[in-house]
């Protein structure tokens, strides 16, 4: 899988047996600023059970809270989440990251769960 960053928080990867962690993806320019912009890419091999979570900062950003702490909290929630129902997992992540505050920004969350070749 090929990934690029366009001004968003780092994607979080979960692999069976390898844990859950933010991926180091070189930052690119904010999406839509320059139609001719080049984006550095990162290659990630797909293995059965691979899960990738991508979000906008509206999901995790809280005034007065360090963004790295918010990313770490989301990583922890993803590490503990049940992956048998992605709809429920997404609901859990949205609730866990916003239950204590009023959101002031839009939220986008994408979760990919690779089950393997069929």
Which functions belong to the PLM regions below?
Residues 1-118:
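Conserved subregion of the PPM/PP2C metallophosphatase catalytic domain
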């Amino acid at each position: 899988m090929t990934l690029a960053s366009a001004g968003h928080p780092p994607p979080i990867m979960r692999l069976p047996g390898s844990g859950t962690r933010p991926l180091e993806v070189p930052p690119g320019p904010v999406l839509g600023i320059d139609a001719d912009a080049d984006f550095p890419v990162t290659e990630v091999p797909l293995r059965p059970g691979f899960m990738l979570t991508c979000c906008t900062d509206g999901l995790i950003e809280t005034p007065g809270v360090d963004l790295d702490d918010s990313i770490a909290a989301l990583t922890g929630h993803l590490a503990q989440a049940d992956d048998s129902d992605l709809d429920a997992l997404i609901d859990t992540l949205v609730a866990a990251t916003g239950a204590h505050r009023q959101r002031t920004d839009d939220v986008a969350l994408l979760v990919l769960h690779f089950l393997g070749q069929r």
